[in-house]
Amino acid sequence: MNYPVCVLTMHHCNNNENDFAIRPELFKKALLMALDEGYKFINYAQFKDIVAGRSKASKKSILLTFDDGYFDNYKFAYPILKELNIPAVCFLITDKIRDFKRQDYDFSFKKHKEIDYDKDAEYFLNLDEIRQMQESGLFEFDSHTASHFSCRSDDEAKLREEFSSSLAKIKELFPEKTEFGFCFPKGHFNEFSQRIVKEYYGFAFSVIDGGFCMGDDKFKIRRIDISNNAKSESDYIFRIKKKLFVYSTPFIGKIYSDFRNRSFK
């Protein structure tokens, strides 16, 4: 059986009340729910084997991904993942990586839409935090462009600059890596950018809702958003549980995803 992988995507794990953030306590409850329901969190190497056709996914497989590389991933999510021994992938905006010593661990986190990508360096992971997470064996990192540039653009020179610069930084930071993936910022892409990205990376993630099966288009890998826009904790857990059930079920998940995303080509 060609089982789907449920690739989960999120941005923030902090105590802000907004659609892009999951409170740490709720994040842990969601992970424990998935484990209690028999789901298995796979690491990035295992997922890359599935993408490349070197192995098949087991039933109820999950890959956890974080977009942008925010400091709250380190402060709040990372300790929970260490406690539960759950691996994850983080897609870095590579121009935001700084080698600085963090002075204050208690600053008030801004809401996602209030973050200034040019000025708010402290909201992103620094080099030491990235290294700690990578050396734990739980986290791997890949590219999310250099500057969070929209890949709906038709500016070939700028797209190539974003792809190549980000790839070069990832290679510099992780010289042992031999396979490189990409995540489209905000999930935005078009046929033009998708064609160009193939020259630099082996696969790419979208935000098209759904699971990923071996043999699917590996340059628009579907993911399942687990950001918190629910009315209550119980509603949130129910929604995640339902999404996992639907998208981990062969055939049913594919039909449902295709119907929901019929505007995508």
State the predicted function of each range.
Residues 1-65, 71-72, 76, 155-265:
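C-terminal active-site subregion of NodB/CE4 polysaccharide deacetylases
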Residues 3, 8-14, 60-62, 82-188, ...:
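Metal-dependent polysaccharide deacetylase catalytic core of the NodB/CE4 family, i.e.
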Residues 70-71, 147:
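Short, glycine/acidic-enriched loop or turn micro-motifs at the edges of active sites
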